[in-house]
Amino acid sequence: MSEVTTAEFNEEGKYLRKIRSFVLREGRLTKGQAQAIETQWPTMGLDYSPAPLDLADVFGRKADTVLEIGFGMGASLVQMAQEAPELNFIGIEVHKPGVGSCLSDAAAAGVTNLRVYHHDAMEVLEHAIADGSLTRVQLFFPDPWHKKRHHKRRIVQAEFAELIRRKLKIGGVFHMATDWENYSEHMLEVMNVASGYKNQSADGTVVPRPDHRPLTKFEARGHRLGHGVWDLMFERIA
């Protein structure tokens, strides 16, 4: 965990690489988070290497694998892993306190089917995840880049959709969620023209929140205030 990369996007939506040496100033760790990283990383942490993971070796079994991009503090990811022990889960997060919090929660919950990267998701997907190996890819509440001039910096772009499609098995699902309606519309525009996908919504728009995605405290509060959340699920069909 000595170096972390972050992805940036230019105005055409192309990925740029910005490598920086990791320093603790980039995120203050609580004692609990630091201790969790120290004690749990050897068993749950995945050190980035530009070679495809052997998932059966990593998890000690063969099982369908779910990958989440940007899990934040990790509470929902840990809950999903706890509620679906038959699945393998991989989480990717560049924010170190989030990694520490996730590992702490996972250890407290006794979760054994979760592995975590502290690295840029684009590099992990491009180099460390084999094509056709994932059952589901999750992208929940990504940065909306709400200013119009920044929309092309949003992670959901045609190139990204194709990358996710390659990593999914046939029949695998790309599940997105956002609390910005404009971003949900952007996601639909991108995904509806992306080759090899089928929208799982009956009317070609969004889907109700599926049972596998936990309702977060933030989201529940938003519902009470009349705020919306939009879920999109696209199946790989080719």
UniProtKB/Swiss-Prot annotation:
Residues involved in substrate binding:
147, 179, 216-219
Ordered alphabetically, the record's keywords are: Methyltransferase, S-adenosyl-L-methionine, Transferase, tRNA processing
Q: Does the keyword Transferase apply?
A: yes
**First-level EC class:** transferase
- Pfam families given in the database record: Methyltransf_4 (PF02390)
Report the catalytic activity: guanosine(46) in tRNA + S-adenosyl-L-methionine = N(7)-methylguanosine(46) in tRNA + S-adenosyl-L-homocysteine
Q: Does the keyword section mention Methyltransferase?
A: yes
Described purpose of this protein according to its UniProt entry: Catalyzes the formation of N(7)-methylguanine at position 46 (m7G46) in tRNA.
* Name of the molecule in the record: tRNA (guanine-N(7)-)-methyltransferase
Say which species the protein is native to. Shewanella oneidensis (strain ATCC 700550 / JCM 31522 / CIP 106686 / LMG 19005 / NCIMB 14063 / MR-1)
Corresponding gene? trmB
